[in-house]
Swiss-Prot record:
Keywords, sorted A to Z: Cytoplasm, Metal-binding, Repeat, Transferase, Ubl conjugation pathway, Zinc, Zinc-finger
Protein name: E3 ubiquitin-protein ligase listerin
Domain of life, source organism: Eukaryota
GO molecular function: ribosomal large subunit binding; ubiquitin protein ligase activity; zinc ion binding
Gene3D superfamilies listed in its UniProt record: Leucine-rich Repeat Variant, Zinc/RING finger domain, C3HC4 (zinc finger)
Keyword Repeat: yes
Any one Gene Ontology cellular component term annotated for this protein: RQC complex
SUPFAM superfamilies assigned to the protein according to its UniProt record, in alphabetical order: RING/U-box (SSF57850)
Function: E3 ubiquitin-protein ligase. Component of the ribosome quality control complex (RQC), a ribosome-associated complex that mediates ubiquitination and extraction of incompletely synthesized nascent chains for proteasomal degradation. Ubiquitination leads to vcp/p97 recruitment for extraction and degradation of the incomplete translation product.
Catalytic activity field: S-ubiquitinyl-[E2 ubiquitin-conjugating enzyme]-L-cysteine + [acceptor protein]-L-lysine = [E2 ubiquitin-conjugating enzyme]-L-cysteine + N(6)-ubiquitinyl-[acceptor protein]-L-lysine
Record-stated family: Belongs to the LTN1 family.
Zinc finger (RING-type): 1446-1499
Length: 1503
């Protein structure tokens, strides 16, 4: 729908317009209107006629302009502007609009008036000459609107004239229509115009508001015209004079309360050429002027009255009507005596008015009397009121100053009036000291200075004046007189004021720093005149009273006073204060001889120590140099690191003797150290000074290596900034010495090699993990010394800092512009090589300690180094070295010749066969090609000569290619290759002896440190374990033939798993996470049960554990259990996890071995034991291994995971309900401690804050980071809580903790609920939030899914409502249904489910018992929802079947065991629950309470 159609539709729906249409169609007129009709619109129709010649849409819009609601009128004007813009023929519309302009341009709504002006502009611009016929109606209203009280409307009206007419016609238009405007304005003011009465439909303002607005606007029409065209134009006077001839109007104006209207009328009267006559003919105006000379309002009444008085005073006609002596003069005195806001106006009009008054009053003698009285009136009614405006007060002071200046410059009256002026000036000065404003003080002091410089008054009178003012200053006090004192003593003042200045300085109660400073900055004549008159110098002798900003002026004054030979009484004691230190820095023979010579050396030392604390080296150097010249030696050790101090000393070293060279070199090295150790960058002059003193033999003493050797985390930006500082320094050095300085400052190639040698133990990571052909040097055949995690990360971090620093410096490379290529010097290539090696080392470190994330510094360092590395020929040439580093070989792809040369070099004394080299380093061969070449080449594989490196190389590369080929080995076309590779795994790892080969397991069994002694063996073993894991994953996840899968599971898996267990037995507690340890951990996590084929000879030594000896463990079991829990207490997390993985396999054995009787499946349910049944026990090693401290931070959660394993329903653990309850009781105490460790003691990023905070933070992090990707918060929750991710990564323990928390609330909901109840209040809300937001909804979802997927038979139908968390169970018997509703709360299990039972089909008390039993099961006994429903169903089943209740507990199903009464009395045949007869789990213990074993009913003996 177009805009035009929408307007038509809107107009059609308008109520008044529709009504008008209905009237027109029915032939009705306006007679008989109902109250619902718009009478204002009907009345306006007469004015609008029939709108002939315009379309319906325009007609409707025009009618909106007469609506009562101003918003409708505004809308109509906007629609009208759209019509004007869109329609070409608008003449008829223009004619009708012209009739509405008078009402619209004076409308009560400013918006309507504004839019009216804009609409007129559009009409004039579009119609141009065609608009002439309506100008007589429009332009007068436009000119009237130019004076609108709303600025926006006035501006829009001005735009009508500006845009609607050509430039040369604008003035003519205004002049042409001005008389009409004046006539209309005059009538509106007098209330004789139609527009002065509100229009019926205008409800925007009331009558009085409209009247006031239009009166103001009308008078503004006259005043604005006069302002624009000047008073010479008289066309306005005819209509304006009518206003002053209208007595009623004038009485209304001056008798009313509209002050603005009065001011406008007065201003208009002043503009007449015969203004005095107009004013005098209107008595109310004269009276108004006299009465408002002291008006206190903030309106312009007062200024307008004084303007009229200035007009009237010279007029003789005014003198005949008003007496100057008896009328005006007394009125002036009253106005001057009055202290109020009228002085803001009086300042500008009083002096001209007084001058006119004196001129008209006649004789000089009379004038002197009048003038004296006027001046005395200034000081009447003092002091000023406290609430007086400060602007008014300042105006009073300015007016007085103007009068004094006028009087003293008038030779006729100045000396005559001086006697009266003198005390008045003193009084005014005293009054100025009561106002703490600088403007008032400046007014008075400028007047005094002017009087002194005028020289009209003799010196004696001036001195008397100043003495009187000084006495007033003393009387006012220090604070009140502060501004006056400062201004009177300012530099540049007349020397006459020196007496006052000296007296102020000599008075301790009046002097302050500004007065002292004014003296120190004064000119010589003034200074000498003042200083000679000072009688007391105590103001400067107490130097401790001055701060550091004042010390400079004080020292300058002291120096001036010391140089003045006539001053003898100065007594200053130099101390370690701001003035004393400034005196020392100022120096000079005069200060030294008169003040500093006898100062103790300790005082000077204290000054130097102070500057050292403030890091002001320049001051120290200046002071030390001056004192040294004076023969005083000072201790400057503390300032040795201050750059300014060192630079200043270097610059002061004038001598170049050999004896000073050593001292100079020490200073240069100290300056070098200070610049680069400073947190802030040095200034350019610092670098310039250092570069001037650096020579080619400068030795930094490995400064930067020491600088970066810090164990604390270092800011990468600081390293880069340090490199930039080096570049700045090198750029400033002389060209012939620059390269030598670079060589001495940056790291040399030899030094780089020395650093890399520290990381030989990490070369094992490259051999085991790199997919590239690995170089093996002779060093790999020797024992590695593995560093612990802390030390390893520390030295890698230091090396990364050094590498980044060296490679970031731009001075390490230069360009050959002609070839447009980089060329590196030996140093630069060494730094590049070092950088490549360091990033490889960082990656190796990251792999080794994979459970802990690299520090932010190491990650950032690696990125920054990588960005600056360049693959160049110079770096590749380093590979030609006879012993290239394995890190560099891994980072770069060696050429065939390089590889061949290197292998041959390492294979001495025998050469490597050419075909072997071809196999190893053939270009572009796939993993399968390599495997086939090795398989068909007849090389020594698995059982090889270990003295030859190339045999190791072939074996290592073979297994790496097998890993790359992966599960495809199973489907290789050459079946022999598959068998060859699979048998190779067993061959390398198996315990059997083949010829002279001793396999990995044998070697470890005989020599546990064998891998450390020969790293190649560890690399090979690691890779074959990794190959097994890759193939095992392929069997699980890929589609392979059934025969292949069965062969794998029946032969390879059991054999290799037993080898893993034997390898675990050889793991040492202190062993570092080498590739073998990490890979073995992965392998241990793949085992689902403890292998049964582990030979007993795996037990080499037996560690006696007293707690285990009481149970029937085999020697092998006891040995492995002891080993697993020993590893749990390791400080190495990977070793801890190996112990945990083994313990997890051993828990089923431990649980069954330590609870043999309770877990006996053959026990007769009906058999009753007199003695209490044995409780289930937590495996003793779990409770024994619980840490008593927080050294091993992960042990608690790991043990908790082991402890709750029996509660999981698996092949190893199938506990009935009674056993579950018994085991929950057994682990209750342990669970509380372990859960507390899980929640509170995990030191991730928060100290003394629950681990759940970390979990919550992690969830929010993922939700924020991946909100726009496929990673959602929900998927992260499932990953953390539901998936058992055993991948060794920095997130391992976070995910482990999350999963363990979820398992805990799933298996032990009641225990978790109790834990939440008892944790400290400050942790409780956090724990509640995390469980509710993340874990609860997943737990509820799991519980509902279990119930949904369960089968309950035909009689019980169960459905779930996921939205509300409800489970509805309906038990049906014939046509009757009993419904049980369980509703899980949002924070389940922290809150218990709500349960409701409807339509019980048994007795109410029995149904209630069932519900109470279900509630107790879920609330206290860690019961699952599904098991609770099954228990309730069994109760109902038995109740329906008529099973008898146990007569002890009166229940059919036992509350805890969920068993029916099965123990039968042989005499009475009644059945009882066995736990009711003998149990520690229940309140009913009949045999205990009765102290006999008889039947509760027939008393027959059970035994």
């Amino acid at each position: 729908m177009s805009k035009q159609q929408r307007r038509k539709g809107n107009a059609k729906n308008a109520s008044s317009a529709s009504a008008h249409g209905y009237l027109a169609q029915g032939g009705e007129n306006f007679v008989g209107l109902t109250p619902e009709m718009n009478i204002f619109e009907m009345a306006s129709s007469n004015r609008l006629s029939n709108f002939s010649g315009i379309d319906d849409e325009t007609r409707i819009v025009m009618r909106k302009l007469t609506k009562k609601d101003c918003q409708t009128r505004e809308k109509g004007l906007r629609e009208l502007t759209n019509i004007i813009a869109e329609t070409s023929s608008i003449e008829n519309c223009y004619e009708h609009f012209c009739g509405l302009v008078p009402q619209l341009s004076t409308d009560g709504s400013p918006t309507v008036r504004l839019l009216t002006m804009k609409t007129i502009t559009l009409f004039l611009v579009k119609l141009e000459k065609s608009a002439c016929k309506g100008l007589k109606k429009i332009i007068p209203m436009v000119l009237f609107a130019r004076c609108d009280v709303t600025n926006g409307v006035a501006a829009a009206a001005g735009a009508v004239i500006r845009d609607g007419f050509e430039a040369d016609k604008k003035q003519k238009v205004i002049q042409l229509f001005a008389p009409l405007v004046f006539e209309m304005a005059a009538k509106i003011v007098q209330g004789k115009h139609d527009l002065s009465v509100p229009v019926e439909y205008d409800a925007s303002e009331d009558r009085e508001a409209r009247k006031s607005r239009l009166e103001t606007q009308s008078l503004n029409v006259f005043l604005s015209y006069i302002k624009e065209f000047g008073a010479d134009s008289t066309i306005w006077e005819e209509e304006a004079r009518k206003l002053f001839e209208n007595i009623a109007f004038l009485k209304m104006v001056f008798g009313g309360t509209n002050a603005a209207l009065k001011v406008q009328v007065l201003n208009l009267a002043y503009r007449f050429k015969n203004n005095v006559e107009v004013i005098l003919n209107t008595p109310s105006i004269v009276t108004y002027i006299q009465n408002h000379l002291d008006s206190q309002t903030f309106t312009p009444e007062c200024s307008t009255a004084w303007e009229g008085m200035i007009i009237l005073l010279p007029s003789a006609q005014f003198h005949t009507k008003v007496s100057l002596q008896n009328g005006i003069y007394p009125r002036f005195l009253n106005v001057i005596r009055k202290k109020g806001n009228h002085w803001r106006v009086l300042q500008h009009f009083l002096l001209p008015a007084v001058v006119l008054l004196l001129k008209e009053m006649g004789s000089l003698e009379n004038n002197m009397k009048v003038l004296g009285t006027i001046m005395e009136s200034f000081t009447d009614n003092l002091p000023w009121p406290t609430d007086a405006s400060i602007n008014a007060v300042l105006s009073w002071f300015n007016a007085f100053s103007d009068f004094v200046r006028w009087i003293l410059t008038n030779d006729r009256i100045n000396l005559v009036v001086w006697e009266k002026l003198h005390p008045l000036i003193v009084t005014v000065t005293e009054q100025a000291m009561t106002f703490p404003t600088k403007e008032i003080a400046e007014c008075v002091t400028d007047l005094l200075q002017w009087i002194i410089e005028l020289k009209t008054i003799n010196e004696a009178d001036v001195s008397t004046l100043l003495l009187n003012i000084e006495s007033k200053i003393v009387g006012a006090g220090t604070e009140n007189s502060r501004l006056i004192k400062h201004l009177l003593t300012e530099p540049g003042k007349n020397i006459v004021l020196s007496n006052l200045h000296a007296n102020l300085l000599s008075s301790p109660e009046l002097v302050d720093f500004q007065i002292i400073k004014n003296l120190s900055c004064s000119e010589n004549d003034y200074f000498n005149a003042t200083s000679q008159k000072i009688s007391n110098f105590s103001f400067i002798e107490k130097t401790e009273n001055f701060d550091i900003t004042q010390a400079g002026d004080i020292v300058r004054l002291i120096k001036l006073l010391l140089e003045n030979q006539e001053i003898k009484s100065l007594n200053i004691s130099v101390k370690n204060d701001h003035v004393g230190r400034r005196l020392l820095l100022t120096g000079g023979s005069t200060i030294w001889n008169k003040l500093l010579k006898n100062v103790p050396v300790s005082t000077f030392q204290n000054m130097i120590n102070y500057w050292h604390e403030k890091r002001n080296g320049t001051a120290i150097a200046d002071a030390v140099s001056f004192l040294k010249e004076m023969g005083v030696e000072m201790d400057t050790k503390q300032a040795a690191e201050n750059v300014e101090f060192l630079i200043t000393l270097l610059r002061k070293m004038k001598s170049t003797d050999v004896s000073n060279e050593a001292e100079k070199n020490v200073l240069i090295l100290k300056l070098f150290t200070a610049i680069f150790e400073s947190d802030e960058d040095a200034k350019s002059e610092h670098y310039n000074c250092l570069s001037e003193h650096l020579t080619s033999d400068f030795n930094s003493g490995q400064f930067f290596e020491k600088l970066f050797a810090s164990s604390e985390e270092y800011d990468i930006e600081r390293i880069l900034e340090t490199a930039c500082r080096v570049d700045k320094l090198i750029d400033l050095c002389e060209e012939q010495t620059r390269q030598n300085i670079v060589n001495n400052v940056l790291l040399s190639g030899k030094q780089c090699g020395t650093i890399i040698e520290q990381f030989q133990f990490l070369e094992l990571e490259v051999m085991s993990c790199s997919t590239k052909p690995t170089v093996i040097s002779t060093t790999h055949q020797h024992c590695y010394s593995h560093l612990d995690e802390h030390k390893a990360k520390e030295i890698v971090t230091e090396s990364a800092r050094i590498a980044l620093f060296n490679i970031s410096s731009k001075c390490e490379c230069f360009f050959l512009i002609s070839h447009e290529q980089f060329f590196f010097s030996d140093y630069n290539s060494a730094h590049q090589v070092f950088g490549w090696q360091v990033i490889s080392i960082i990656s190796a470190l990251e792999k080794r300690y994979s459970l802990v994330a690299l520090t932010e510094e190491l990650q950032r360092s690696r990125r920054e180094i990588e960005e600056r590395l360049i693959r160049s020929d110079e770096v590749r040439f380093k590979l030609d070295d006879s012993s290239p580093c394995i890190f560099l070989a891994d980072a770069y792809d060696m050429s065939f010749e390089q590889k061949k040369k290197y292998i041959q070099c390492q294979a001495e004394p025998s050469k490597v066969p050419e075909h072997a080299l071809e196999v190893l380093y053939r270009e572009n061969q796939t993993p399968l090609d390599f495997l086939m070449n090795v398989f068909e080449g007849g090389y020594q594989m698995f059982d090889f000569d270990r003295s030859k490196n190339y045999h190791w190389m072939i074996n290592l590369m073979f297994v790496k290619k097998c890993i790359q080929y992966g599960g495809s080995i199973f489907v290789a076309e050459e079946s022999g290759l598959r068998d060859y590779a699979l048998c190779g795994i067993v061959t390398v790892l198996d315990i059997h002896k083949r010829s002279t080969l001793q396999q990995s397991t044998d070697i470890l069994g005989n020599t546990p440190n064998a891998f450390d002694e020969d790293p190649r063996l560890e690399a090979l073993t690691t890779l074959f374990i990794e190959l097994y894991l890759v193939l095992n994953d392929s069997i699980k996840n890929d589609n392979h033939p059934t025969q292949t899968i069965e062969e794998w599971k029946e032969f390879y898996v059991p054999t290799i798993n037993s080898l893993f267990i034997r390898m675990f037995r050889m793991i040492r507690k202190e062993q570092q996470p080498t590739p073998f340890v990490r890979t073995l951990l992965k392998a241990m996590f793949t085992l689902v049960e403890f292998p049964t084929n582990v030979p007993n000879d795996s037990v080499v030594t037996r560690e006696f554990v007293p707690e285990l000896s009481v149970f029937k463990y085999s020697l092998l079991e006891e040995s492995f259990i002891a080993q697993a829990f020993i590893l749990l207490s390791s400080n190495v997390e990977h070793v801890q996890l190996i112990g945990y993985a083994a313990a997890k396999l051993l828990v089923p054995i431990m649980f069954k071995t330590e609870n043999p009787q309770v877990l006996d499946d053959d026990q007769d349910e009906t058999e009753i034991m007199v003695a209490n049944r044995s409780k289930l026990n937590l495996p003793v090693m779990i409770s024994k291994s619980y840490p008593v401290d927080h050294i091993h931070k992960h042990v608690g959660p790991l043990l908790l995971s082991l402890a709750i394993l029996p509660l999981e329903t698996t092949k190893e653990f199938v506990l009935n309900q009674e056993q579950r309850v018994a085991y929950c009781d057994a682990i209750d105490s342990f669970f509380k401690n372990a859960l507390n460790a899980l929640m509170l003691d995990q030191p991730f990023d928060f100290s003394q804050v629950p681990i759940v905070c970390k979990i919550r933070k992690q969830m929010y992090f993922f939700q924020f980071r991946y909100s726009s990707h496929f990673f959602t918060a929900k998927s992260q929750e499932r990953e953390y809580y539901l998936q058992s991710d055993l991948t060794a990564s920095p997130l391992f323990f976070e995910k482990f903790a999350s999963r363990l928390l979820f398992k805990s609330i799933t298996l032990l909901p009641a225990a978790v609920r109790l834990f939440h109840k008892n944790i400290p209040n400050n942790f409780k809300p956090i724990f509640q939030e995390v469980v509710t937001k993340h874990a609860s909804k997943l737990l509820i979802e799991n519980e509902l899914n279990k119930v949904q997927n369960a089968e309950f038979g035909e009689v019980l139908k169960v459905r779930t409502v996921p939205v509300t968390g409800q489970i509805i169970s309906e038990y049906t018997v014939e046509d009757t249904k009993m419904k049980l509703t369980i509703e899980l709360p949002r924070d389940y299990p922290l809150s218990v489910p709500a349960m409701n039972l409807d339509k019980a089909i048994v007795k109410g008390d029995r149904a209630k018992k069932w519900l109470l039993q279900l509630n107790a099961y879920l609330f206290h006994q860690n019961g699952a929802i599904l098991e609770g429903i099954e228990m309730w169903k069994r109760n109902v089943d038995k109740g329906i079947e008529g099973a008898e209740d146990c007569t002890i507990c009166m229940m059919t199903v036992h509350q805890q065991t969920n068993q029916l009464p099965k123990v039968k009395c042989k005499q009475c045949k009644n059945r009882f629950h066995s736990n009711c007869l003998v149990s520690s789990f229940h309140t009913y213990k009949w045999f205990e309470s009765s102290n006999q074993s008889t039947c509760p009913l027939c008393r027959n003996n059970f035994t």
